[in-house]
Amino acid sequence: MTLEEIVSAIEQLTVAELAELVKMLEDKFGVSASAPVMAMPMAGAAAGGAAAAEEKTEFDVVLKSFGAKKIEVIKVIREITGLGLKEAKDLVEKAGTPDAVVKQGAAKEEAEEIKKKLEAAGAEVELK
């Protein structure tokens, strides 16, 4: 199986199946797909809290609400994530919950671009 075939197979999975795949890979290889919570010692974190906030380079794009234009927001979600119609609709309907993450670990520029596209479609978005 080539890498292209693997990517093609992964593209066909639902969000729930992708989450299960990630869990299986984490268990199989003994790793975690989540970003580390604390990268510096406690004393450094207390002293440089404001500086740490400015230096953040990865953001999670979270959908807070889809507003009055649900269909437009679904279209933008599909464009950004490559999800199928059902998966994109399910994600949009989770707006306001912790599960409504459109993109995890996005670079600052990418996260701001995604936020701009979603807000133009009528959604309320938060960068975490």
From Swiss-Prot:
Keywords, ordered alphabetically: Ribonucleoprotein, Ribosomal protein
Matching SUPFAM superfamilies: ClpS-like, Ribosomal protein L7/12, oligomerisation (N-terminal) domain
InterPro entries in the record: Ribosomal_bL12, Ribosomal_bL12_C, Ribosomal_bL12_C/ClpS-like, Ribosomal_bL12_oligo, Ribosomal_bL12_oligo_N_sf
One of the GO BP terms on file: translation
A GO term, aspect molecular function: structural constituent of ribosome
Coiled-coil region list: none
Subunit structure: Homodimer. Part of the ribosomal stalk of the 50S ribosomal subunit. Forms a multimeric L10(L12)X complex, where L10 forms an elongated spine to which 2 to 4 L12 dimers bind in a sequential fashion. Binds GTP-bound translation factors.
Record's function text: Forms part of the ribosomal stalk which helps the ribosome interact with GTP-bound translation factors. Is thus essential for accurate translation.
Protein family: Belongs to the bacterial ribosomal protein bL12 family.
Protein's UniProt name: Large ribosomal subunit protein bL12
Source organism: Thermosipho africanus (strain TCF52B)
Taxonomy of the source species: Bacteria, Thermotogati, Thermotogota, Thermotogae, Thermotogales
Gene: rplL
